[in-house]
């Protein structure tokens, strides 16, 4: 097995020029796997249970059913209106939206919508939560960009 040790310096030099976009303004993804249930700031913790007919295990691929449709997740940030919009088709019962100060201004009223349903507090003021920050840093291991708030559709 070749180690490609002579390429490591080239790879590291290439990586210096790349920056991770922690918070893209929008994203659109599709999934057929129950464990692919989190994308950037959107998580669907019970995706496999909510939509068993839309999920397929890789060992069963290609799916035997022609009715199998991927779950589509789209989200956009509107910084001028302090709004986060999430659209999931087909709809799932439980969606979590994680927020950071890079996404919304916690000092102003904000709106968070999942499938056109408001999930933010009635007064629009979203309060950061230290427990969410610590748990997120622990589970994701990203101590530089932890999520500050989680809003749930349940």
Protein language model regions, located:
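Alpha/beta-hydrolase-fold serine-hydrolase catalytic core, especially in secreted/extracellular enzymes
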Residues: 1-154
């Amino acid at each position: 097995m070749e180690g490609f040790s002579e390429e490591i310096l080239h790879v590291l030099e290439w990586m210096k020029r790349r920056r991770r976009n922690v918070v893209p303004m929008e994203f659109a993804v599709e999934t057929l796997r129950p464990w692919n249930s989190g994308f950037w700031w959107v998580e669907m913790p019970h995706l496999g249970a909510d939509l068993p007919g839309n999920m397929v295990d890789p060992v069963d691929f290609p799916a035997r059913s022609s009715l199998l449709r991927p779950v589509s997740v789209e989200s956009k940030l509107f910084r001028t209106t302090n709004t986060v919009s999430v659209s999931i088709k087909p709809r799932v019962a439980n969606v979590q939206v994680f927020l950071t100060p890079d996404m919304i201004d916690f000092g102003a009223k904000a709106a968070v919508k999942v499938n056109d349903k408001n999930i933010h507090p009635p007064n629009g003021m979203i309060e950061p939560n230290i427990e969410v920050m610590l748990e997120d840093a622990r589970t994701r291991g990203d101590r530089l960009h932890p999520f500050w708030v989680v809003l749930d559709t349940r």
